[in-house]
Amino acid sequence: MERINTTFYKTKVIPQLQQKYSYSNVHQIPKLRSIHLNRCLGAVSQKIFQKSSEEIAMISGQRPKITYAKKAIAGFQIRKGMPIGMTVTLRRERMYDFLTKFIHLILPRLKDFRGLNPTSFDGNGNYHMGLPDQLAFPEIDYDQIDQYRGMDISIITTAKTDEEAKFLLEALGMRFQ
């Protein structure tokens, strides 16, 4: 298991990208910009919200930012200004640490994992995926969770096309179907 960091990116990934796409400028070479973790809970009790916030903090290594409802939706029992979710943005070393853990520990632990879906790119070189539950993360203790809650993970790159982004992520170690 090789640790993904800026040195790995510069020594292993950049030469592969340069060889395949022949960039004329080093600033054209795609790189990771950030990783976003997002969890939406809706109308839940303060205790559940706090526990979920602690889980995201353990998974990401930093405290999440709370997101609030912009408008009231009676069908979902949500009022304006009510906390409904949380998000974390990882950059620099924390981003590379999370990506290393995600590729080498979390993805192999997912049930029936045969590779990531290659159609989950957004057309701008970013990759988005959802996890059904939090049990794949080694920081989460099975006995301490009360309900399975998934999360969305977005990997933001500077790639101009999905093809470049897919090649970048494959060079970093992600497997696609």
Curated annotation (Swiss-Prot):
- What molecular functions are annotated in GO for this chain? rRNA binding; structural constituent of ribosome
Question: Where does it primarily localize?
Answer: plastid
Pfam families from the xrefs? Answer: Ribosomal_L5 (PF00281), Ribosomal_L5_C (PF00673)
Write out the annotated subcellular location.
Answer: Plastid, Chloroplast
Keyword annotations for this protein, in alphabetical order, are: Chloroplast, Plastid, Ribonucleoprotein, Ribosomal protein, RNA-binding, rRNA-binding
Query: From the record, what ranges are coiled-coil?
Result: none
Per the record, the domain of life is: Eukaryota
Biological process according to GO: translation
Q: Cellular component terms, GO, for this chain's entry?
A: chloroplast; ribonucleoprotein complex; ribosome
Instruction: Describe the function of this protein.
Output: Binds 5S rRNA, forms part of the central protuberance of the 50S subunit.
**Its quaternary structure?**
Part of the 50S ribosomal subunit; contacts the 5S rRNA.
Q: Which family does it belong to?
A: Belongs to the universal ribosomal protein uL5 family.
What is this protein's name? Large ribosomal subunit protein uL5c
From which lineage does this chain's organism come?
Answer: Eukaryota, Rhodophyta, Bangiophyceae, Cyanidiales, Cyanidiaceae
